């Protein structure tokens, strides 16, 4: 699926602000980055659940730090809300940093996000 104009703009701002330290992957399945370990049913269930969940943007730094960035407009559908919760859960289990922004202004104004990027550079 091609990116919408808003997403392309978001990607552009992400790229200008964090490249060359990170690779940015738009519209990518989280499972491609996340391989939850463990044989217990809960983990298997999680993998099944997350197989087809696409994160809006996944950033990956050279030292393999991964953060999932999800961008929804003001009104997220029920399905999007559920998707967000699943992504958050996967991130929590796999020590991926998760950020959610309504728009690029929101992102650039996020102290946590900027701090995360700065910490990662040190």
Segments (PLM) and residue ranges:
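Short histidine/acidic/glycine/proline-rich micro-motifs that form metal-
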Residues: 1, 74-78, 104-105
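N-terminal topogenic membrane-targeting module
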Residues: 1-40
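Conserved catalytic cores of phosphodiester-cleaving nucleases, focusing on short active-site segments
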Residues: 14, 55-59, 68-74, 91
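Short, well-structured secondary-structure segments
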Residues: 23-29, 68-69, 97-100
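Active-site metal-binding core of divalent-cation-utilizing nuclease and nuclease-like domains
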Residues: 26-63
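Active-site-adjacent loop/helix micro-motif of nuclease/hydrolase catalytic cores
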Residues: 50, 77-84, 109
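Arginine/glycine-rich "motif VI" loop of SF2 helicases in the C-terminal RecA-like domain
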Residues: 62-64, 89-97
């Amino acid at each position: 699926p091609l990116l919408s104009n808003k997403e392309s703009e978001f990607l552009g701002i992400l790229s200008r602000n964090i490249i060359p330290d990170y690779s940015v992957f738009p519209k990518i399945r989280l499972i491609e980055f996340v391989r939850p370990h463990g044989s217990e049913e809960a983990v298997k269930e999680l993998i099944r659940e997350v197989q087809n969940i696409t994160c809006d943007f996944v950033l990956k730094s050279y030292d393999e730090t991964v953060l999932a960035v999800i961008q929804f407009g003001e009104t997220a559908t029920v399905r999007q809300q559920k998707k967000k919760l699943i992504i958050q859960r996967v991130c929590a289990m796999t020590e991926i940093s998760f950020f959610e922004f309504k728009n690029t202004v929101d992102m650039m104004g996020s102290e946590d996000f900027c701090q995360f990027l700065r910490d990662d550079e040190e």
